[in-house]
Amino acid sequence: MAKRVQVVLSQDVYKLGRDGDLVEVAPGYARNFLLPQGLAQPVTRGVLKQVEFRRAREAARLVAEKEAAVARKTALETIGRFVIKKQAGEGESIFGTVTNGDVAEAIQVATTQEVDRREITLPEIHKLGFYKVQVKLHADVTAEVEIQVAAL
């Protein structure tokens, strides 16, 4: 069995790992490719400390992002209902449809929070009334708000 050496990746390497990962590779691969190309560093105490510091900082950033998303969720759900005005015809049907952009604009007007329209999930809306809409604020945080489609 060949001896393997540990290196810390300085960049993402295809089929090997991401920046900051501690990986075991063949000594020739490390010596002839990874180290000369600047894709990895040999493992030392100082490098391991840097890796741990980076991981801790990244974990703290992810926790802060999730907390901010939860705060935005409570703010959106506190307001609860957003009104979108559309031109309507007979039988409560509206001209056109309500889009993700309309919902994002209504949320921005009411809360001054910018919401990406691609993160909004809503049903097909062709009539006046009340509808439930999901707004994805984070990978783990989704807010559910109600929109009211009203006539102009």
UniProtKB/Swiss-Prot annotation:
Highest taxon in the source lineage: Bacteria
Coiled coil, from the record: none
A UniProt-annotated Pfam family: Ribosomal_L9_C
GO MF entry, a single one: structural constituent of ribosome
Alphabetical keyword list: Ribonucleoprotein, Ribosomal protein, RNA-binding, rRNA-binding
Biological process annotations from GO: translation
Listed GO CC annotations: ribonucleoprotein complex; ribosome
HAMAP family to which the protein is assigned, alphabetical: Ribosomal_bL9
NCBIfam families, A to Z: L9
Entry similarity comment: Belongs to the bacterial ribosomal protein bL9 family.
Function field: Binds to the 23S rRNA.
UniProt-recorded name of the protein: Large ribosomal subunit protein bL9
Provenance organism: Synechococcus elongatus (strain ATCC 33912 / PCC 7942 / FACHB-805)
